[in-house]
Swiss-Prot record:
Disordered: annotated segments: 1-73, 177-226
GO biological process, one term: pituitary gland development
Organism per entry: Sapajus apella (Brown-capped capuchin)
Biased composition (Basic residues): 64-73
Record's protein name: Homeobox protein prophet of Pit-1
The organism's place on the tree of life at top rank: Eukaryota
Function: Possibly involved in the ontogenesis of pituitary gonadotropes, as well as somatotropes, lactotropes and caudomedial thyrotropes.
GO cellular component: nucleus; transcription regulator complex
Amino acid sequence: MEAERRSQPGKPKKGRVCSSLLLERHPASGTLTTMVDSSAPPSRKRPGAGVGRPRFSPQGGQRGRPHSRRRHRTTFSAVQLEQLESAFGRNQYPDIWARESLARDTGLSEARIQVWFQNRRAKQRKQERSLLQPLAHLSPATFSGFLPGSPAGPYSYTTPPPPVTCFPHPYSHDFPSQPSTGGTFALPHQSEDGYPTLHPAPAGHLPCPPPPPMLPLSLEPSKSWN
């Protein structure tokens, strides 16, 4: 038995662990393949390792977070505000020459003056919207009480005028009650001075238009009175 074991020195024994890498030549392709010992324990990675940790740049700051730029607020004196408000009242959109002239008077830069005018115009628009917002919810009937000649009260309405009564013409003629002969027109009643009697209509009413003239029933000549 010992002779057989000595005759096969390259055969590995059972139960031994090979820690080295073995290179063998593949018989078909002739390429070299690497054999790794499968008995070595695989490396285990902890879950969450390296996740969520901020990366720091060589300068000491965190990567991916830009530094917030601090804004420099300009404080205006009372004299400067008075000059700016006066210029805003004259012109809300000054050109470059007006801004440079105002910069020399106030001692500010032209860019600061331009930003101030932009903020001032935005403030004015906001004030105008706040003043018009309560009036937008009111209906047109609300303003009827504030019209001249209307009774007091924002929600009062004027009563409609009474219907107009039609009366005869103010200068109507009195026709005689005597029957007229055929084919003749009835003459109006004449007063002592020879003019027809006129009766005005009651005041406060509109007169009706006069009736159309009546056509003669016959064309016979008028008969004289006996």
